[in-house]
Amino acid sequence: NTSGLLMIPKNNKTHEYLANLIKNHDLIKKYHAILVGNYPRDNDVISDPIGRNNLNPKKMAVRPDGRPSVTKLKVIERFGNEATYVELNLITGRTHQIRVHTSYKKHPVYNDTMYGAGQGKVKTEEQVLQSYYLKFAKPFSQEIIELEIEPDEKLSKVLTYFRNRRV
């Protein structure tokens, strides 16, 4: 249910190329999210291993026997103790990585019903997490492609709510 930019390969050759970009950390993927609470550090690197949740096979969890997983976090804006607007940079790309890492740090993604506390004061249909930036070398030509989008409706709605409360 994450919104924003998405890469879909059209053929096997491009799929293989994309898989290698990810494996070699040559694909830069950044996300914007609203986290519950006041995240304690302005910059953080979360490097807890992630694996399948033993109690619920549809969920992932931080586990000592999990796969290495690294998420860089940078605070953009704080809203007191209620919420924190952050940029997240995936170094690895595990299933639900951002949601698992932030929940494990006791600051789940806002309105995340799977890993967080459910709906907050501002209702949205899904968690407030948006893929907003991609940078990679185009297959075959190696031309650098850089894509960036503005905050979507759900992110804007929650940001507006918290910004208006400060006034």
What function would you assign to each model-found segment?
Residues N1-V167:
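RNA pseudouridine synthases
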